[in-house]
Amino acid sequence: MLQALLLGLCGAYGHIDWGIGTPFLNRPLVLGPIVGLILGNVEQGIIIGATLEVFFLGAMAIGSYIPPDACVGGVLGTAFAIKAGLSAEMALAMAIPIAIIATSFQNILWSIFSMTSKIADRYADQGNEKGIAAIMFME
Protein backbone atom coordinates (compact mmCIF):
# COMPACT_ATOMS: atom_id res chain seq x y z
CA MET A 1 0.00 0.00 0.00
CA LEU A 2 2.85 2.36 0.86
CA GLN A 3 4.52 1.62 -2.46
CA ALA A 4 1.31 2.45 -4.34
CA LEU A 5 1.04 5.74 -2.48
CA LEU A 6 4.68 6.58 -3.21
CA LEU A 7 4.20 5.71 -6.89
CA GLY A 8 1.21 8.07 -6.98
CA LEU A 9 3.37 10.80 -5.46
CA CYS A 10 6.03 10.02 -8.07
CA GLY A 11 3.43 10.57 -10.81
CA ALA A 12 2.34 13.81 -9.16
CA TYR A 13 5.98 14.90 -9.06
CA GLY A 14 6.18 14.18 -12.78
CA HIS A 15 3.16 16.36 -13.50
CA ILE A 16 4.28 19.31 -11.37
CA ASP A 17 6.11 20.78 -14.36
CA TRP A 18 2.77 21.91 -15.79
CA GLY A 19 2.66 24.57 -13.11
CA ILE A 20 6.30 25.66 -13.13
CA GLY A 21 7.26 25.61 -16.79
CA THR A 22 8.84 22.68 -18.56
CA PRO A 23 11.83 21.28 -16.67
CA PHE A 24 10.99 17.82 -18.13
CA LEU A 25 10.45 16.17 -14.75
CA ASN A 26 7.83 13.96 -16.40
CA ARG A 27 10.29 12.03 -18.54
CA PRO A 28 10.75 8.27 -17.98
CA LEU A 29 14.50 8.86 -17.73
CA VAL A 30 13.87 10.92 -14.57
CA LEU A 31 10.96 8.92 -13.14
CA GLY A 32 12.25 5.40 -13.90
CA PRO A 33 15.03 5.48 -11.30
CA ILE A 34 12.64 6.99 -8.74
CA VAL A 35 10.16 4.16 -9.38
CA GLY A 36 13.04 1.69 -9.12
CA LEU A 37 14.06 3.22 -5.79
CA ILE A 38 10.50 2.94 -4.46
CA LEU A 39 10.24 -0.69 -5.56
CA GLY A 40 13.75 -1.65 -4.44
CA ASN A 41 15.39 -2.15 -7.84
CA VAL A 42 17.07 1.07 -8.94
CA GLU A 43 19.16 -0.63 -11.63
CA GLN A 44 16.10 -2.03 -13.39
CA GLY A 45 14.36 1.34 -12.96
CA ILE A 46 17.23 3.06 -14.78
CA ILE A 47 17.27 0.48 -17.58
CA ILE A 48 13.51 0.57 -18.09
CA GLY A 49 13.38 4.37 -17.77
CA ALA A 50 16.08 4.76 -20.43
CA THR A 51 14.31 2.32 -22.75
CA LEU A 52 11.00 4.14 -22.38
CA GLU A 53 12.71 7.51 -22.86
CA VAL A 54 13.88 6.41 -26.31
CA PHE A 55 10.26 5.84 -27.34
CA PHE A 56 8.89 9.03 -25.76
CA LEU A 57 11.86 11.18 -26.86
CA GLY A 58 10.11 12.80 -29.80
CA ALA A 59 6.66 12.94 -28.21
CA MET A 60 6.09 16.68 -27.89
CA ALA A 61 2.81 18.55 -28.09
CA ILE A 62 2.94 20.58 -31.28
CA GLY A 63 -0.16 22.29 -32.61
CA SER A 64 -3.23 20.21 -31.89
CA TYR A 65 -1.29 16.96 -31.45
CA ILE A 66 -1.29 15.67 -27.88
CA PRO A 67 1.33 12.93 -27.43
CA PRO A 68 0.91 9.88 -25.20
CA ASP A 69 1.42 10.73 -21.53
CA ALA A 70 5.07 9.84 -20.89
CA CYS A 71 4.69 10.38 -17.15
CA VAL A 72 1.84 7.95 -16.54
CA GLY A 73 3.16 5.45 -19.08
CA GLY A 74 6.65 5.67 -17.64
CA VAL A 75 5.67 5.32 -14.00
CA LEU A 76 3.11 2.53 -14.48
CA GLY A 77 5.06 0.69 -17.18
CA THR A 78 8.20 0.71 -15.05
CA ALA A 79 6.32 -0.28 -11.90
CA PHE A 80 4.45 -3.16 -13.55
CA ALA A 81 7.62 -4.46 -15.20
CA ILE A 82 9.68 -4.33 -12.00
CA LYS A 83 6.96 -5.98 -9.89
CA ALA A 84 6.39 -8.71 -12.50
CA GLY A 85 10.11 -9.22 -13.18
CA LEU A 86 9.72 -8.37 -16.87
CA SER A 87 12.27 -7.03 -19.33
CA ALA A 88 12.58 -3.45 -20.56
CA GLU A 89 11.01 -4.50 -23.86
CA MET A 90 7.92 -5.79 -22.07
CA ALA A 91 7.80 -2.57 -20.05
CA LEU A 92 7.70 -0.66 -23.33
CA ALA A 93 4.90 -2.90 -24.61
CA MET A 94 2.88 -2.07 -21.47
CA ALA A 95 3.80 1.62 -21.22
CA ILE A 96 2.61 2.62 -24.69
CA PRO A 97 -1.05 1.58 -24.30
CA ILE A 98 -1.10 2.92 -20.73
CA ALA A 99 0.20 6.28 -21.97
CA ILE A 100 -2.36 6.43 -24.78
CA ILE A 101 -5.24 5.59 -22.41
CA ALA A 102 -4.00 8.22 -19.93
CA THR A 103 -3.97 10.82 -22.70
CA SER A 104 -7.54 9.89 -23.64
CA PHE A 105 -8.66 10.44 -20.04
CA GLN A 106 -6.72 13.70 -19.97
CA ASN A 107 -8.59 14.91 -23.07
CA ILE A 108 -11.91 14.06 -21.43
CA LEU A 109 -10.93 15.98 -18.29
CA TRP A 110 -9.81 19.00 -20.31
CA SER A 111 -13.17 18.99 -22.11
CA ILE A 112 -14.98 18.98 -18.78
CA PHE A 113 -12.71 21.70 -17.39
CA SER A 114 -13.52 23.94 -20.35
CA MET A 115 -17.09 24.07 -19.07
CA THR A 116 -15.97 25.36 -15.67
CA SER A 117 -14.91 28.67 -17.21
CA LYS A 118 -18.58 29.67 -17.21
CA ILE A 119 -18.66 29.16 -13.46
CA ALA A 120 -15.52 31.29 -13.13
CA ASP A 121 -17.20 34.00 -15.23
CA ARG A 122 -20.15 33.98 -12.84
CA TYR A 123 -17.79 34.33 -9.89
CA ALA A 124 -16.05 37.21 -11.64
CA ASP A 125 -19.37 39.00 -12.15
CA GLN A 126 -20.07 38.58 -8.44
CA GLY A 127 -16.57 39.74 -7.47
CA ASN A 128 -15.87 36.41 -5.77
CA GLU A 129 -12.07 36.12 -5.93
CA LYS A 130 -11.96 32.96 -3.81
CA GLY A 131 -14.41 31.25 -6.15
CA ILE A 132 -12.31 32.15 -9.18
CA ALA A 133 -9.17 30.89 -7.44
CA ALA A 134 -10.91 27.62 -6.54
CA ILE A 135 -11.99 27.05 -10.15
CA MET A 136 -8.52 27.85 -11.47
CA PHE A 137 -6.91 25.54 -8.90
CA MET A 138 -9.28 22.74 -9.89
CA GLU A 139 -8.36 23.08 -13.55
What are these regions (language model features)?
Residues 11-18, 44, 81, 85, ...:
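Generic secondary-structure signature for well-ordered alpha-helical cores
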Residues 56-100:
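Long, highly hydrophobic alpha-helical transmembrane signal-anchor segments
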Residues 93-139:
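Helix-loop-helix junctions within the multi-pass membrane cores of secondary transporters/permeases
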Residues 8-12, 34, 79, 95-103, ...:
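Transmembrane helix-bundle signature of multi-pass membrane transporters/permeases
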Residues 1-72:
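Hydrophobic transmembrane alpha-helices
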